[in-house]
């Protein structure tokens, strides 16, 4: 979380491709560290290094996808597909070979990623950057009231959503679903976001920004309200499929559009990195409270609490001042 602004700053200074390549190279070193680590202490150290680089790279890839001459969804959807396939491959390698074999598989995929990244050419973007040499600074962002308010809203909403990744499988099992069915529901919920991403240019560039902000937050509220109330288990399954991953992805896309319209272009990556840090902070702050609710009253009390938090965020979103700038087809691509 602390490293996010730093990653954003150095990406703006030296370029997304160079810094992402460097981050992936550091991850390779971290994976070799996993293979070498003689005890839990060193495993923790290398895990921290790898996690910092992965989390620091993630928001840059979202921005990178919007800078492509192709539609955002046509690029970003491969992230969802890759995640789903990667989980299956890792599980297969783990069972067929050994736990350490997973590390070697990761090394191969990262080397392939670096090779593919080196082949990417962004000529139009590079020409624009040659003309603009303004220094990157966090100061304008700290004086940007709507941006700071937006960070608070996204941090809390994403925090509630991220807590779901931890507790929803157990919540579904607590509602009566067998373990294998609950796991299947969670796995399918990852794939459900793929069509939403693929066709994101159909609505992200055209719908009013206020609607795009309120819609995923409202869906998260409905999701946890259904969890909190004595609802049929099939309704909880449906809401899990519709909301668990899709709302998080929409919030990321909304963040990209809001920042593109509200923030100076030279600070775009830095601003997105700070938003990503706020999302982690929201999770960190809400996680112990959610755990306390579970200890005191079970998953139903936790769901009431999270529904209350996101309900407040939903109401506050209508007080957010919308940016006056234009997104200029941020998600539609510009293929010549």
Predicted regions and their residues:
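Loop-to-transmembrane helix entry/capping segments in MFS-fold secondary transporters
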Residues: 69-79, 179, 263-275
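Juxtamembrane intracellular "pre-TM" segments in multi-pass secondary transporters
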Residues: 120-151, 336
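A late C-terminal transmembrane helix in Major Facilitator Superfamily
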Residues: 267-296
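Helix-loop boundary and gating motifs at the non-cytosolic
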Residues: 1, 146-185, 252
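Hydrophobic core of transmembrane alpha-helices in multi-pass small-molecule transporters
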Residues: 30, 41-57, 155, 235-250
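C-terminal transmembrane helical hairpin of 12-TM major facilitator-type secondary transporters
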Residues: 211-255
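Helix-to-loop junctions at the C-terminal end of transmembrane segments
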Residues: 3-15, 94, 196-208, 294
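Intracellular juxtamembrane helix-capping segments at the cytosolic ends
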Residues: 54-69, 250-263
């Amino acid at each position: 979380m602390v490293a996010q602004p730093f990653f954003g700053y150095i990406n703006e200074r030296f370029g997304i491709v160079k810094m992402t390549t460097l981050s992936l190279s550091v991850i390779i070193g971290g994976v070799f560290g996993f293979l070498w680590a003689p005890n839990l202490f060193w495993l923790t150290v290398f895990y921290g290094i790898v996690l910092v680089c992965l989390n620091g790279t993630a928001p840059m890839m979202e921005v990178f996808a919007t800078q492509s001459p192709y539609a955002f969804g046509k690029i970003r959807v491969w992230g969802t597909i890759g995640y789903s396939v990667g989980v299956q491959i890792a599980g297969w390698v783990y069972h067929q070979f050994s736990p350490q074999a997973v590390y070697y598989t990761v090394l191969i995929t990262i080397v392939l990623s670096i090779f593919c990244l080196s082949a990417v050419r962004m000529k139009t973007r590079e020409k624009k950057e040659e003309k603009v040499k303004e220094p990157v600074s966090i100061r304008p962002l700290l004086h940007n009231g709507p941006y700071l308010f937006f960070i608070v809203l996204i941090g809390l909403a994403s925090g509630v959503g991220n807590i779901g990744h931890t507790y929803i499988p157990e919540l579904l099992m607590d509602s009566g679903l067998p373990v294998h069915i609950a796991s299947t529901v969670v796995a399918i919920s990852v794939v459900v976001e793929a069509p939403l991403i693929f066709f994101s240019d159909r609505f992200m560039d055209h719908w009013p920004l206020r609607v795009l902000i309120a819609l995923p937050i409202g869906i998260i509220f409905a999701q946890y309200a259904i969890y909190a109330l004595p609802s049929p288990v099939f309704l909880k399954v449906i809401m899990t499929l519709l909301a668990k991953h899709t709302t998080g992805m929409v919030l990321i896309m909304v963040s990209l559009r809001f920042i593109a319209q509200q923030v100076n272009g030279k600070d775009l990556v830095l601003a997105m990195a700070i938003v990503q840090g706020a999302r982690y902070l929201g999770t960190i702050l809400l996680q112990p409270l959610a755990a306390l609710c579970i200890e005191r009253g079970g998953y139903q009390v936790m769901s009431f609490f999270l529904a209350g938090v996101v309900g407040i965020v939903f109401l506050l979103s209508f007080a957010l001042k919308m940016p006056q700038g234009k997104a200029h087809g941020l998600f539609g691509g510009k293929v010549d």
